[in-house]
């Protein structure tokens, strides 16, 4: 077992030469400059407040709440009501505002309540009132200028489902301004 440890093995890593952050020391003044303003004395040598200092009549420590004065369970500081039901959101906000001393204390709770509660009753009513309309797609048509692909034989029976065949786009004449003639430079294969 190793019994002798040099403190250098710990401190050496933090020396300026090893950290490579050595720089010349800042120049210091021989006499410290006087600060502007003054320090107001509010207590005597024994630590008691002087009579001229205003003091709270309720408590000399202000509104500080000690550990024993706090409630057994402290509510959360940040609350989101978004995923909660209306009754759960009401119970939670009542619990937060139940102890006003905790809310008013200088070291007390500053709750942040955000979001809107979820009402399942209104959601079911909306679902019942909404009716779904299904629109029947028209039968697919075959464009005469399109190339013939296996399965596009007009003799074969066609399915009435829109995804079964070719869904046509807008039809334009072959030599219209929107559809110029093919370029002779491009080879089509």
Curated annotation (Swiss-Prot):
The keyword Transmembrane does not apply. Keywords: Cell membrane, Cell projection, Cilium, Cilium biogenesis/degradation, Cytoplasm, Cytoskeleton, Flagellum, Membrane. Transmembrane segments: none annotated. InterPro entries: Fltp. Expressed in mono- and multiciliated tissues during planar cell polarity acquisition. GO terms for biological process: cilium organization; flagellated sperm motility. Disruption phenotype: mice were born at the expected Mendelian ratio and are viable and fertile but show basal body docking and ciliogenesis defects in multiciliated lung cells. Residues 137-148 have a biased composition (Polar residues). It is found in: Cytoplasm, Cytoskeleton, Cilium basal body; Cytoplasm, Cytoskeleton, Cilium axoneme; Cytoplasm, Cytoskeleton, Flagellum axoneme; Apical cell membrane. GO terms for cellular component: apical plasma membrane; axonemal B tubule inner sheath; axonemal microtubule; ciliary basal body; cilium; sperm flagellum. Its main location: cytoplasm. Residues 178-189 have a biased composition (Pro residues). It comes from the Eukaryota. CDD domains: Flattop (cd23705). Residues 112-189 are annotated as: Disordered. Microtubule inner protein component of sperm flagellar doublet microtubules. Interacts with DLG3. Belongs to the Flattop family. Microtubule inner protein (MIP) part of the dynein-decorated doublet microtubules (DMTs) in cilia axoneme. Acts as a regulator of cilium basal body docking and positioning in mono- and multiciliated cells. Regulates basal body docking and cilia formation in multiciliated lung cells. Regulates kinocilium positioning and stereocilia bundle morphogenesis in the inner ear. This is Protein Flattop. It comes from Mus musculus.
């Amino acid at each position: 077992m190793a019994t002798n440890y040099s403190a250098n093995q710990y401190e050496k890593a933090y020396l300026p030469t090893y950290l490579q952050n050595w720089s010349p020391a800042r120049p210091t003044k021989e006499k410290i400059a006087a600060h502007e303003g003054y320090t107001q004395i509010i207590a005597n040598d024994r630590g008691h407040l002087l009579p001229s200092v205003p003091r709270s009549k309720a408590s000399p420590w202000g509104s500080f709440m000690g550990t024993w004065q706090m409630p057994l369970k402290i509510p959360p500081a940040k609350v989101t009501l978004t995923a909660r039901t209306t009754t759960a959101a009401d119970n939670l906000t009542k619990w937060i505002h139940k102890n006003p001393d905790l809310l008013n204390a200088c070291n007390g709770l500053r709750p942040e309540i955000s979001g809107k509660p979820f009402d399942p009753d209104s959601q079911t009513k909306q679902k019942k009132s909404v009716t779904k309309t299904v629109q029947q797609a028209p039968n697919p048509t075959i464009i005469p200028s399109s190339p013939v692909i296996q399965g596009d034989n007009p003799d074969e029976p066609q399915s009435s489902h829109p995804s079964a065949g070719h869904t046509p786009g807008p039809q334009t004449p072959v030599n219209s301004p929107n559809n110029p003639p093919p370029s002779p430079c491009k080879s089509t294969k």
